[in-house]
């Protein structure tokens, strides 16, 4: 069977949004070629567990590759992708050139091609994220492993925003805490919260593909006794109180529910948000404060921020 490899040249800012669009369109695998991976700050602090080949990365911008079966509707799919990506600037998301190219690949080639971009990565003092097909031995008894299968949705959990959310969870989750993960994606943040001692984690996503992916990864990590996954739009209809809410979403989506977060998280509880480019930090902080939160800490990595806020 022949497959089409669709490559989109975009920006780091647009990676999560474009990846989501591709998964929504039915991509069977997504690979991200980001040259920032070659020099990023966390590489110096924690050390990558694998070697990267600069020749496989673009000179500038980010290239996102997605794999689709060749069908009669492929051109219609590509046109729909282009339309969805072209809308992103209206949400203040810079897409760069947005150029789309197409290559034909054999099934045996695509089935392994995208996996070369995913390897074990230590993202904090506590956690290492390991793709399911990689063998990995923890370097110490205290190291916690999160196994992820990125084939279905939302990558391997090593984007700066995810990394910062996990580090924020390390700082804040206490044994016995109740947690809600809004926009769970792969389920990585819910799994991390469970492994940090949370007693109950509710993971929600509007996308049924994300729900399926999160359920699979939760089972894979043997945290299904703590984490429940469901389909839901943000915090609509969700009752509290809980100790902590975490949401790694686009800034524009975070702005839609600070008041709901204040309603659901208990007094003195925490709201961790990321997916926020540095230029929008002030806007998000002001919205959180208006809803009754106090900004306790801001984490920064590359051009992204994560905010830890406390409900007054």
From Swiss-Prot:
<dbReference type="GO" id="GO:0005737">
    <property type="term" value="C:cytoplasm"/>
</dbReference>
<comment type="similarity">
    <text>Belongs to the methyltransferase superfamily. PrmA family.</text>
</comment>
<keyword id="KW-0489">Methyltransferase</keyword>
<dbReference type="InterPro" id="IPR004498">
    <property type="entry name" value="Ribosomal_PrmA_MeTrfase"/>
</dbReference>
<dbReference type="Pfam" id="PF06325">
    <property type="entry name" value="PrmA"/>
</dbReference>
<keyword id="KW-0949">S-adenosyl-L-methionine</keyword>
<dbReference type="InterPro" id="IPR029063">
    <property type="entry name" value="SAM-dependent_MTases_sf"/>
</dbReference>
<feature type="binding site">
    <location>
        <position position="205"/>
    </location>
    <ligand>
        <name>S-adenosyl-L-methionine</name>
    </ligand>
</feature>
<protein>
    <recommendedName>
        <fullName>Ribosomal protein L11 methyltransferase</fullName>
        <ecNumber>2.1.1.-</ecNumber>
    </recommendedName>
</protein>
<dbReference type="GO" id="GO:0016279">
    <property type="term" value="F:protein-lysine N-methyltransferase activity"/>
</dbReference>
<feature type="binding site">
    <location>
        <position position="248"/>
    </location>
    <ligand>
        <name>S-adenosyl-L-methionine</name>
    </ligand>
</feature>
<keyword id="KW-0808">Transferase</keyword>
<keyword id="KW-0963">Cytoplasm</keyword>
<dbReference type="GO" id="GO:0032259">
    <property type="term" value="P:methylation"/>
</dbReference>
<feature type="binding site">
    <location>
        <position position="162"/>
    </location>
    <ligand>
        <name>S-adenosyl-L-methionine</name>
    </ligand>
</feature>
<feature type="binding site">
    <location>
        <position position="183"/>
    </location>
    <ligand>
        <name>S-adenosyl-L-methionine</name>
    </ligand>
</feature>
<dbReference type="InterPro" id="IPR050078">
    <property type="entry name" value="Ribosomal_L11_MeTrfase_PrmA"/>
</dbReference>
<comment type="function">
    <text>Methylates ribosomal protein L11.</text>
</comment>
């Amino acid at each position: 069977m022949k497959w089409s490899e669709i490559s989109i040249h975009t920006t780091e800012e647009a990676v999560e949004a474009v990846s989501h669009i591709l998964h929504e369109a039915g991509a069977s695998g997504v690979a991200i070629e980001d040259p920032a991976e070659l020099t990023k700050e966390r590489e110096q602090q924690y050390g990558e567990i694998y070697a990267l080949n600069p020749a496989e990365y673009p000179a500038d911008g980010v290239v996102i590759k997605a794999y689709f079966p060749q069908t009669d509707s492929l051109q219609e799919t590509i046109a729909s992708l282009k339309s969805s990506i072209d809308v992103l600037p209206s949400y203040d998301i810079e897409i760069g050139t947005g150029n789309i190219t197409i290559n034909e690949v054999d099934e045996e080639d695509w089935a392994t091609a995208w996996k070369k971009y995913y390897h074990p990565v230590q993202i904090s003092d506590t956690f290492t994220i390991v793709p399911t097909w990689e063998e990995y031995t923890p370097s110490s008894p205290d190291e916690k492993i999160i196994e992820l299968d990125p084939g279905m949705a939302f990558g391997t959990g090593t984007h700066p925003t995810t990394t910062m959310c996990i580090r924020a969870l390390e700082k804040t989750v206490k044994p016995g805490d109740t947690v809600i993960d809004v926009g769970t994606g792969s389920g990585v943040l819910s799994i991390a919260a469970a492994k940090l001692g949370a007693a109950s984690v509710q993971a929600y996503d509007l996308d049924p593909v994300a729900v399926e992916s999160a359920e699979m990864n939760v089972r894979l990590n043997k945290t299904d006794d703590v984490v429940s996954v469901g389909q839901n739009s943000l915090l609509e209809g969700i009752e509290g109180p809980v100790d902590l809410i975490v949401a790694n979403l686009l800034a524009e989506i975070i702005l839609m529910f600070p008041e709901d977060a204040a309603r659901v998280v208990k007094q003195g509880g925490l709201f961790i948000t990321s997916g926020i480019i540095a230029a929008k930090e002030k806007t998000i902080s002001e919205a959180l404060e208006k809803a009754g939160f106090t900004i306790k800490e801001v984490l920064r990595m590359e051009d992204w921020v994560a905010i830890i806020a406390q409900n007054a």
